[in-house]
Amino acid sequence: MGERFFRNEMPEFVPEDLSGEEETVTECKDSLTKLLSLPYKSFSEKLHRYALSIKDKVVWETWERSGKRVRDYNLYTGVLGTAYLLFKSYQVTRNEDDLKLCLENVEACDVASRDSERVTFICGYAGVCALGAVAAKCLGDDQLYDRYLARFRGIRLPSDLPYELLYGRAGYLWACLFLNKHIGQESISSERMRSVVEEIFRAGRQLGNKGTCPLMYEWHGKRYWGAAHGLAGIMNVLMHTELEPDEIKDVKGTLSYMIQNRFPSGNYLSSEGSKSDRLVHWCHGAPGVALTLVKAAQVYNTKEFVEAAMEAGEVVWSRGLLKRVGICHGISGNTYVFLSLYRLTRNPKYLYRAKAFASFLLDKSEKLISEGQMHGGDRPFSLFEGIGGMAYMLLDMNDPTQALFPGYEL
């Protein structure tokens, strides 16, 4: 178990130096504690500079170095992830050059994905069209906006499409929600979205059990619980939609089942029946479930979900300092748990913990990767596996009350 994460030896709390100047924080034992002592404004400015330098490196490695050719188009590991990072940079800095470069990336992804049968936001053509439409609207390019929106509306879902987030109906539905949030409700009609919601409930009830877990789904023969392929991801998307009373009851019942059947450690199973308490990732384990429980706490305002979200956060603090940098199964993704809990509770403890995980990355990740003690990711510049996701998270910490896990929180 210990091989997957670094032991978290960071203090439970480090008070900020009230002088407000980075140069005055000099009496600390080490560089990590010095970062933790910085006032948040100084700290976020430091993160901001570092994030923009990483963004430039990601653009070079994934876009310019290849001669602007796209082999892998998707948001998870490909060039669309670079486009999304550029869009985040534009949102934070208002630098239109980033927005224009974002659209340049999207257009290349559009060409590369034209024959793709994948229809989700993170791993499919829906992500290309959705991000393209939103970025074009921000730039004021009405012709391009209309083109991407029309292409999105032209997407048809295969009858054998699974239900999970990365490749299934939940992932398509998330793309619809993303569009409606950024360009206006009913951009994608409620009727169209409702038909997808109903199909997700129909399938989930077939495999579920009213007395235990009302909704259940399979992906490649396994009944996953996590954010990427399982219950947490599907419930998260459903809670962003208008549901009928019986549907709300089933979502709440499914989440309660997961809480009641988690590991004694507080971590969550990767799949139904699993006895292996190893994974503390966004994709599998407590981090992704925590984000879903925060959403449940916001929507249903019940003590059960608030407490369970905070308990999942304790697992992440204890075992979430992973030996990877990315957002899917790395420290950057786990940092979002604390940002989400801070948004829910406004408890400064969670902002400190987000600051601590980000400080660890800022202070140690380059050295640990170069020494082989930390993994830079199979696709080291990508949004979900590599430093692209780290840059995105660091930019998000500019305003922690608005920080949202990309492709998951809305």
Swiss-Prot record:
Listed GO CC annotations: extrinsic component of membrane; plasma membrane
Gene Ontology terms for molecular function: abscisic acid binding; metal ion binding
Binding site for Zn(2+): 283, 328-329
Domain of life: Eukaryota
Protein family (similarity comment): Belongs to the LanC-like protein family.
PANTHER family attached to this UniProt entry: LANC-LIKE PROTEIN (PTHR12736), LANC-LIKE PROTEIN 3 (PTHR12736:SF7)
Subunit structure, as described in the record: May interact (via C-terminus) with GPA1.
Protein name from the UniProt record: LanC-like protein GCR2
Source organism (scientific name): Arabidopsis thaliana
Chain's gene name: GCR2
